[in-house]
Amino acid sequence: MSCQPFTSADTFLPLNSEASAALPLIMHPGAAECLPGSNHATNVVSTATGLHYSVPSCHYGNQPSTYGVMAGGLTPCLYKFPEHGLGPGFPAAHQPLLAEGPAVADFKQELRRRSKLAEEPVDTESPEIRELEKFANEFKVRRIKLGYTQTNVGEALAAVHGSEFSQTTICRFENLQLSFKNACKLKAILSKWLEEAEQVGALYNEKVGANERKRKRRTTISIAAKDALERHFGEQNKPSSQEIMRMAEELNLEKEVVRVWFCNRRQREKRVKTSLNQSLFTISKEHLECR
């Protein structure tokens, strides 16, 4: 509260020792607040003649108003502050008056309107939603194909963008459990990560292909085909290239598969014969020793 100038109606008469008992000191109602040395205790103002008048302590000079007190009246506050007394001359304002003013009512109405807008569901048939769903599915497939887990992706993103990324975040994105706004933000980050991961994977595959021979998939031969090959092996254990091609066409197998089968079959027979010869030699030796 600011000090106000005296009006023209306020006058002071000089005081002397004779008139001091009859004339009171005329003061403006707000003048006590402007006196120097005010504090929370009762101050005493001494005149030149020794008169003493009690002046109420000032509570406004060094304390901010906690109820939004402005010049010309009370303005409601939007925030809650600690409760303090307003001091002499100003009764405490009633709380409903401060909380339900026009400004606060408009503010609450605006909050309710924004909350209602935030709760409105996003159109699930919009192109943006469909594009997001498509990317989430493609991301999961490509991530698995590259050999990365959700934990791998979360740790990689957390190292660059912060700890808010984790395995749970990636899982919720792939299952479309994030809000539309957060999913759109994460989509841009995952797109960049996926692009770099595929580049690294391509370089690794090129390096492996140059240094190592790619192993062919193991071929499974049916029982009927094995029986036919066994019959051919009994007739000719070393077939020519033309015979191998003919057998491959009859059995619906690749020529290389038939050729390898005959090679393996000859090696197996050789091992069996070697083992049999060793057994016969051992038996003969033992028989001679017994004599």
Curated annotation (Swiss-Prot):
One of its GO terms (molecular function) is DNA-binding transcription factor activity, RNA polymerase II-specific. SMART domains: HOX, POU. Keywords: Activator, DNA-binding, Homeobox, Nucleus, Transcription, Transcription regulation. Residues 214-273 bind DNA. Residues 124-198 form the POU-specific domain. Transmembrane segments: none annotated. It comes from the Eukaryota. Its main location: nucleus. It is found in: Nucleus. The keyword GTP-binding does not apply. GO terms for cellular component: cytosol; nucleoplasm; nucleus. One of its GO terms (biological process) is regulation of transcription by RNA polymerase II. Changing F81L: May be a predisposing factor for congenital dwarfism. InterPro entries: HD, Homeobox_CS, Homeodomain-like_sf, Lambda_DNA-bd_dom_sf, POU, POU_dom, POU_domain_TF. A motif (9aaTAD) lies at residues 5-13. Signal peptide: none annotated. Belongs to the POU transcription factor family. Class-1 subfamily. Interacts with PITX1. Interacts with LHX3. Interacts with ELK1. The 9aaTAD motif is a transactivation domain present in a large number of yeast and animal transcription factors. Transcription factor involved in the specification of the lactotrope, somatotrope, and thyrotrope phenotypes in the developing anterior pituitary. Activates growth hormone and prolactin genes. Specifically binds to the consensus sequence 5'-TAAAT-3'. This is Pituitary-specific positive transcription factor 1. It comes from Canis lupus familiaris (Dog). The lineage of its organism: Eukaryota, Metazoa, Chordata, Craniata, Vertebrata.
